Amino acid sequence: MPSEKLLRKYARLAVRAGVHVQKGQMLIISAPVSNPEFVRMCQEEAYQAGAGEVVLDWFDDRAERNDLQYAPLKTLQNVAQWKKDKRRYEQARHCCFLHIDSTIPGVLKGLDPEKLDAVMAARRKAMQPFRDYTMASRGQWSIVAVPNAAWAGKVFPKLEEKQAVEKLWNAIFKTVYLTRDNDPVQEWKQHDRMIAKHCRRLNQYRFQELHFVSELGTDLTVGLPEGHIWGGGDETAKLTKAVFNPNMPTEETFTSPSRSRVNGIVYASKPLNSQGRLIENFWLRFENGRVVDYHAKKEQAALKAILEADANSARLGEVALISYDSPISLMNLLFYDTLFDENASCHLALGASYPDCMKDGASMSDKELMAHDCNVSSVHVDFMFGTRRMKITGVTAAGREVPVFDNGNFVF
């Protein structure tokens, strides 16, 4: 385990720069049972920051696997009314959410895929009305991560358990700019300013489309809707006006693509961990915004489930640009966790777009977002496709071609 000093600095970072709890505000912490010490530190930091109430929602992925394996499908598909009432109560109080991630790669491997997909679909449908609170950044939310032995063993398979866990802790600290001697909260303010520079430049160009080409075979044109906005780094919550960082780490500059003007083929550059199933070596072919063909060397059924989750899950909801020479990429680690791996590579997301990435999008209905060529879906699944040789060209309304990436990196 890291020193108490480092853990407390990490907890402070999560509370004050991540979710940025406000005076008197309710904070909901969803946390793994495997790391209670760090969770209690976050709770304490939140109260010291002025939180009015801190609610701990514990989860256990292995216990969840038992439920999914043994409980009847009808039981699992029934999302209890009290769970929806709880979320409605929390959001009515303008709460904020901190999720402490601790993935267990492959934890759902071997389960009946049809049963699993049916359960996830029922849960998404039941909780969809409450996802907009975070997707549209009405309140603050943030995700940070802590290791567990299974995850560390997957990332560092040649090390003994204790060494692997320690090394994963160190890797996580590096991704969030936390050292023994620095002030990580101030470090993140500087980091956010750097990301904002890329956002400003991309927003100035008002590109109509981006063309992606890579050595893996990607040749994809992604249209951008009129009124799209590039974002990244910190955000401002609509209800509380608090500035927060949704993902820690983050290196991306992102926007909502056109739901109808995506054409070509894209090859994933990293595996995708979806609900504990690792989808590997896959590609997608798009026509007029929709996936019309696909293949995965491993877990194709899991990829199929994503694409068929609802009527719009086979369309794109996000395009994100990250230099190949970003700090996380240069670590040359596969984390088997999208929170990290998406920040080592340009990525796309199947499913829902972010309303904030469209002018006045946060106040639009689903129907209005669709009318503005933004996608609406019950899922949002990121996958990585950036490479060392990736080239990206932006095309303006006047037809001018502007280099955006060369050899995997921003040119401006």
Describe each region flagged by the PLM.
Residues 12, 203-205, 275-277, 312, ...:
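Short solvent-exposed loop/turn micro-motifs enriched in small/polar/acidic residues
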Residues 109-111, 153-157, 233-235, 277-280, ...:
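A short secondary-structure junction signal
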Residues 367-412:
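Extended hydrophobic packing segments that form well-structured cores
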Residues 1-263, 394, 400, 410-412:
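Active-site bordering "gate/hinge" segments
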Residues 253-309:
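Long, well-ordered mid-to-C-terminal structural blocks that present hydrophobic/aromatic surfaces
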Residues 293-362:
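Dual-mode signal for accessory low-complexity, basic/Gly-rich regions
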